């Protein structure tokens, strides 16, 4: 009989475990069923969304805010923590911003602030409806641009997973990550017209432990741009294009910028972009440092500047052209990069005369020019370390003497 006596307690323990597991399932806060949201594309979602967030954030057990399928108009929303327990947002529907840029007085549309243990998922779409903004966003119209909203902002967010979300036609950046730690963005889809200005796919700064994985980015500016203070970051399995490539920077434009270090970009495909793997710093008086940057296993398809270090970065020729960049670049590698260049200059290393690039490595490079001329490589103020087979031959071409005007 003793063996049978042992079975009953075991079954009882399993039952208790099952009951306990069922209790830790997140409580659902449905913006339609519980908070009165209407998926009619006209009624503002802001209050139901914020009310659902506040109630979920105050819960002492894990919770999920649910936005069901349908089309919702959202004027803007600021979702703040800290929350008392882990919190999720399950976005199944399409959330649209007001199309008129004048509806925004600051650069925020959907903002998450000071949230920990957060997840957003569901296959939903954040549609910035940016077409009117694109027409008015010119180099001269700075005041207008300063009020354009980012589609989704993550500010001071820790331990987060953003998964299976689409950002469409943002008026400015699609996603901005600032002062975040341990945040993963995975299986995202980002799309805007190739002529849409300042629509960086994902931009980050002053963040650590950011991972961007298995995402498709088509936009009018950098697919991914990495600002100052970014550390220990992984970017992999990205398809980029159209756009301006994957960029470190721009850096050196402002005082007291923090170092960028420990960035690995690998297993990416970049197609029909103006740049591929790029580091860009401004000429002028402000310093900074960039180190341990590694581009590896990247395919370039018809990219105008596949490999580029540009320390004379000067978009629209608005910089101090006669000054050298004060940003120090060191320990940078480009390995196993292959494909085609739309222009003959497949590799450009334009480093600072006052602070030359240190320990720049080229290994196993094979980039063919799509035109009749052979691909070339240009070098200024750098002596790259070379490993393996290299095409084009390093530093084989002339060096431009004026700052570049590419964005």
Curated annotation (Swiss-Prot):
It catalyses: (1,4-alpha-D-galacturonosyl)n+m + H2O = (1,4-alpha-D-galacturonosyl)n + (1,4-alpha-D-galacturonosyl)m. The keyword Secreted applies. Residues 1-26 form the signal peptide. Pollen. GO terms for biological process: carbohydrate metabolic process; cell wall organization. Transmembrane segments: none annotated. Keywords: Cell wall, Cell wall biogenesis/degradation, Disulfide bond, Glycoprotein, Glycosidase, Hydrolase, Repeat, Secreted, Signal. This is Polygalacturonase. It comes from Gossypium barbadense (Sea Island cotton).
């Amino acid at each position: 009989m003793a063996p049978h006596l042992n079975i009953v307690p075991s079954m009882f323990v399993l039952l208790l475990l099952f009951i306990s597991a069922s209790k830790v399932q997140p409580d659902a806060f449905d913006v339609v069923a519980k908070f009165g949201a209407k998926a009619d594309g006209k009624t503002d979602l802001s209050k139901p969304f914020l009310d659902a967030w506040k109630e979920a954030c105050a819960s002492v057990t894990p919770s999920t805010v649910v936005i069901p399928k349908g089309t919702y108009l959202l004027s803007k929303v600021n979702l703040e923590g800290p929350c008392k327990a882990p919190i999720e947002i399950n976005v199944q529907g399409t959330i649209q911003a007001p199309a008129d840029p004048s509806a925004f007085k600051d650069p925020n549309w959907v903002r998450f602030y000071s949230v920990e243990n957060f997840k957003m998922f569901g296959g939903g779409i954040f549609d910035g409806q940016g077409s009117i903004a694109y027409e008015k966003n010119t180099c001269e119209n700075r005041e207008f641009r300063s009020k354009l909203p980012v589609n989704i902002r993550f500010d001071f967010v820790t331990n987060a997973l953003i998964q299976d979300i689409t950002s469409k036609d943002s008026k400015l950046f699609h996603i901005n990550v600032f002062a975040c730690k341990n945040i993963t963005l995975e299986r995202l889809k980002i799309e805007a017209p190739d002529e849409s200005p300042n629509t960086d796919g994902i931009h980050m700064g002053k963040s650590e432990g950011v991972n961007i994985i298995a995402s498709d980015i088509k936009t009018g500016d950098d697919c991914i741009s990495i600002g100052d203070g970014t550390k220990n970051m992984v970017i992999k399995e990205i398809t980029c294009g159209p756009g301006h490539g994957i960029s470190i920077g721009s850096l050196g434009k402002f005082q007291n910028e923090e170092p960028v270090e420990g960035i690995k970009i690998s297993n990416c495909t970049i197609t029909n972009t103006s740049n591929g793997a790029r580091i860009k710093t401004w000429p002028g008086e402000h310093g900074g440092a960039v180190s341990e940057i590694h581009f590896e296993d990247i395919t370039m398809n018809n990219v105008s500047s596949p490999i580029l270090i540009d320390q004379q970065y000067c978009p629209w020729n608005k910089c101090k052209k006669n000054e050298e960049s004060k940003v120090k670049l060191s320990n940078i590698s480009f390995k196993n990069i292959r494909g085609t260049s739309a222009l003959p200059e497949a590799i450009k290393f334009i480093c600072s005369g006052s602070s030359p690039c240190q320990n720049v490595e080229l290994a196993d490079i094979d980039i063919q020019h799509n035109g009749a001329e052979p691909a070339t490589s240009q070098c200024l103020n750098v002596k790259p370390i070379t490993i393996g087979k290299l095409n084009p031959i390093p530093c084989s071409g002339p060096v431009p003497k004026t700052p570049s005007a590419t964005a």
